Amino acid sequence: MAKKSMIAKNKRPAKHSTQAYTRCERCGRPHSVYRKFHLCRICFRELAYKGQIPGVKKASW
């Protein structure tokens, strides 16, 4: 879990466009965040297995 101060800092608008970075909206993790879903890989996997992300299912080939 991210510190509350870091999550609050991320919600503020950046002074410059290059300062903006993605953070997981569920847990606040800064690394391995899928931009389309705004979730980190760990949260994405949990929610996908539960079927809470529409249009996402486990791949099989």
Swiss-Prot record:
Annotated Zn(2+) binding sites: 24, 27, 40, 43
Keywords: Metal-binding, Ribonucleoprotein, Ribosomal protein, RNA-binding, rRNA-binding, Zinc
GO biological process: translation
GO molecular function annotation: rRNA binding; structural constituent of ribosome; zinc ion binding
GO cellular component assignments: small ribosomal subunit
Needed cofactors: Zn(2+)
Pfam families membership: Ribosomal_S14
Note accompanying the cofactor annotation: Binds 1 zinc ion per subunit.
NCBIfam families noted in UniProt: PRK08061.1
Family listed: Belongs to the universal ribosomal protein uS14 family. Zinc-binding uS14 subfamily.
Subunit structure: Part of the 30S ribosomal subunit. Contacts proteins S3 and S10.
Entry function: Binds 16S rRNA, required for the assembly of 30S particles and may also be responsible for determining the conformation of the 16S rRNA at the A site.
Name of the protein described by the UniProt record: Small ribosomal subunit protein uS14C
Provenance organism: Enterococcus faecalis (strain ATCC 700802 / V583)
